[in-house]
């Protein structure tokens, strides 16, 4: 049996006519930049997320940049974040000449350990940037309490978690600003790069809308130094179609996750979802010993897996200048040696899930 990790083609086949029609409409109208589909998508994202402002952009990475630029993050400002995530989180901080300050993670959720954050706050700290890793929000109440105490901003990196919830609020409606990514393999993905910034702050929203168009406040007049960060109309058209089916896909992803957990929880560490939270199941990530051997064995059986992430950010070459060293974040480092992500998409069948579970059990037992 061969299994597709994300199965984007099967998803496309299910929605083919609507997606094709949406793309053809854009081609006929030829409004490839900031066409009507962009504003329609933003309105629908606001409704789905329960937030006042959704501003689409060119990628999740650019969404992080736009969020920090809107907050006027300056060189040498410090932003507290996690070392166990995709590089964009800290890369964008560094691109603005600010400094990522890492705090270790919780061993069960892989999210930043809120109990350790306050010790990392200095006079230069301007914001906390938790990542909703693998689809589940971090301990936002605890983080927000620290932020309020020290007059800090909170930016939610929800690149992997669109559709998740924390105390019945969507992940996009947390913090001062939240972002997400619409990279194709994300819970809600387009057919290229795309992202969005979410906020209830009118001033941030107004500024972000200018920043994504080179800081332009009216045609050929530029209030800020900005960037070319708009979402293409075709991507917006695709997302408009897929957003209609997204609630059902979220349900299906949870069913897949629950079935995995039922079959695997007695032999390895399966994901922990904390009370008052739901996950968008951007990944289904477990811990195993002899991770590389297990990954190779599963590959032989036609089961694709991924490792997110093999090297903690504080040990990446690009962040050597931060002067962290091996052993500084032991929970993150241990996770890098043990995590493996199993196939996760809304179209996995029970037979496929059972096959994955059985092959893992064969190798571990």
Question: What are the functions of these language-model segments?
Answer:
Residues 1-29, 36:
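N-terminal "arm"/small-domain region of PLP-dependent enzymes with the aminotransferase-like
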Residues 9, 38-43, 48-54, 115, ...:
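PLP-dependent aminotransferase class I/II
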Residues 14, 73, 253:
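Pyridoxal 5′-phosphate
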Residues 30-78, 92-96, 102-104, 169:
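Phosphate-binding glycine-rich loop
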Residues 55, 80, 101, 155, ...:
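Structural detector of well-ordered beta-strand residues that form the stable sheet scaffold
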Residues 69-158, 165, 363:
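PLP-dependent aminotransferase-like
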Residues 156-189, 218-223:
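Conserved active-site segment immediately N-terminal to the catalytic lysine
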Residues 180-181, 195-200:
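Short beta-strand-to-turn element immediately C-terminal to the catalytic PLP-Schiff-base lysine
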């Amino acid at each position: 049996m061969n299994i597709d990790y994300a199965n984007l083609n099967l998803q496309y086949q299910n929605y083919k006519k609507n997606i094709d029609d949406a793309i053809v409409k854009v081609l006929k109208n030829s409004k490839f930049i900031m066409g009507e589909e962009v504003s329609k998508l933003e309105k629908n994202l606001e409704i789905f997320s329960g937030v006042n402002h959704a501003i689409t952009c060119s990628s999740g990475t650019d969404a992080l940049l736009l969020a920090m630029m809107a907050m006027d993050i300056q060189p040498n400002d410090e932003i507290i974040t996690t070392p166990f995530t995709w590089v964009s989180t800290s890369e964008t901080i560094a691109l603005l000449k600010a400094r990522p300050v890492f705090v270790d993670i919780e061993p069960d959720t892989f999210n930043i350990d809120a109990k350790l954050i306050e010790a990392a706050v200095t006079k230069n700290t301007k914001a906390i940037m938790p990542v909703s890793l693998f689809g589940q929000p971090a301990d936002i109440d605890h983080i927000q309490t620290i932020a309020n105490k020290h007059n800090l901003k909170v930016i939610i990196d929800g690149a992997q978690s669109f559709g998740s919830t924390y105390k019945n609020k969507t992940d996009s409606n947390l913090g001062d600003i939240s972002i997400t990514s619409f990279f194709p393999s994300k819970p809600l993905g387009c057919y290229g790069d795309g992202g969005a910034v979410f906020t209830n702050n009118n001033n941030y929203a107004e500024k972000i809308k200018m920043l994504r168009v080179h800081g332009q406040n009216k045609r050929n007049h530029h209030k800020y130094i900005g960037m070319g960060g708009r979402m293409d109309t075709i991507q917006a058209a695709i997302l408009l179609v897929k957003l209609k089916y997204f609630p059902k896909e979220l349900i299906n992803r949870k069913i897949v996750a629950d079935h995995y957990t039922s079959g695997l929880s007695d032999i390895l560490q399966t994901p922990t979802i904390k009370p008052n939270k739901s996950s968008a199941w951007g990944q289904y990530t477990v811990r195993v010993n002899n991770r590389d051997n297990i990954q190779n064995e599963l590959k032989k059986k036609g089961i694709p897996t991924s490792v997110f992430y093999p090297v903690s950010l504080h040990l990446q070459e690009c962040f050597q200048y931060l002067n962290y060293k091996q052993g500084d974040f032991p929970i993150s480092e241990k996770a890098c040696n043990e995590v493996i992500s199993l196939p996760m998409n809304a179209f996995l069948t029970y037979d496929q899930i059972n096959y994955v579970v059985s092959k893992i059990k064969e190798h571990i037992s």
